[in-house]
Amino acid sequence: MKIIHFLATMAISSLLGACNGGQYIVNRDPVDYVNPYIGNISHLLVPTFPTIQLPNSMLRVYPERADYTTELLNGLPIIVTNHRERSAFNLSPYQGTNLNPIIAYNYDNEHLTPDSYEVELDDNRMKAEYALSHRSALYRITFEADKPVYIIINSRNGSIHVGENFISGHQQLSDNTNVNVYIEP
């Protein structure tokens, strides 16, 4: 009788063990466990924003909007100098004829990680992808193919210089600090 119970237990254990064989372990990096949306809505304090920044790096970016729950992005930031205010430089991709220094976009399918940002802009007519390293960053912007394309770079309190294969600029912050940018298309 003990042998039958032992064999039945072994058979059931083997059957249950075989059921788990279809699952596989996904190798995840530590960055996959970070949720940049934690702590973004506060009813008592000023809200913070989901931030894209590597530890101890010079660049910090977050989607520029009035608050976390708004439906519009106010352009795409190039660099943010603190955790709750506007960016030092602003980039606005555009297709159309109404050019403004900063363009408000409706957006969808936003995806943030600590080192990248991806969003579809203006009713999915444009897609912006942003990746950063410690001292530089890369924007990739995909447009509709059949319309003229414009990219507007804005410096609120500074200047922009357009060269043959580069764009450079500086902006004066409120505490007499200069922020410089060098962009290659």
How should each PLM-predicted stretch be described?
Residues 2-9, 13:
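Sec-dependent signal peptide recognition
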Residues 17-18:
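C-terminal motif of bacterial Sec signal peptides marking the signal peptidase cleavage site
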Residues 24-185:
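Accessory carbohydrate-recognition regions in carbohydrate-active enzymes
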